[in-house]
């Protein structure tokens, strides 16, 4: 059985543009993303943001939100509580922070042993 790639789990097949923020946090995942849809500015169909802690979440989130297309998906990759590196964020704290900023979690994936990804969309008003 073939293992799904991170790009497959993120449903990138229909995305026409993708922006990655703080990719140096996990270059292995960044290297798996489809190069043909990469962009360095928004609006983007998909924004993938890496946050190792609350400080990075608060720093990169406004940039990600600004770059996100109206119907786009924001993926926040974060360290699992069981990861070898300490973190002060988790799915619930990220979703709470995002909701305060008009975006809500809709799905989750496991990226690898140390990282998870939370998919978020703009809250419809």
Q: What is the predicted role of each segment?
A:
Residues 47-57:
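Short, glycine-rich nucleotide/cofactor-binding loops
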Residues 25-30, 84-86:
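Short, charged/polar "capping" segments at the starts of alpha-helices
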Residues 35-44:
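Short acidic low-complexity segments
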Residues 102-125:
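Class I S-adenosyl-L-methionine
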Residues 1-28:
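N-terminal, charge-rich interaction modules
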């Amino acid at each position: 059985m073939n293992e799904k790639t991170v790009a497959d789990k993120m449903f990138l097949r229909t995305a026409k543009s993708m922006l990655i923020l703080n990719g140096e946090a996990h270059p292995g995942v960044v290297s798996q993303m489809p190069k043909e849809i990469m962009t360095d500015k928004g609006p983007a169909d998909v924004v993938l943001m890496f946050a190792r802690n609350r400080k990075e979440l608060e720093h990169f989130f406004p940039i990600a939100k600004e770059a996100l297309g109206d119907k786009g998906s924001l993926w926040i990759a974060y360290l699992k509580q069981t990861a070898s590196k300490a973190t002060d964020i988790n799915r619930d704290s990220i979703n709470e922070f995002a909701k305060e900023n008009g975006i809500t979690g809709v799905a989750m994936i496991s990226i690898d042993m140390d990282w998870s990804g939370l998919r978020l969309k703009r809250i419809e008003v």
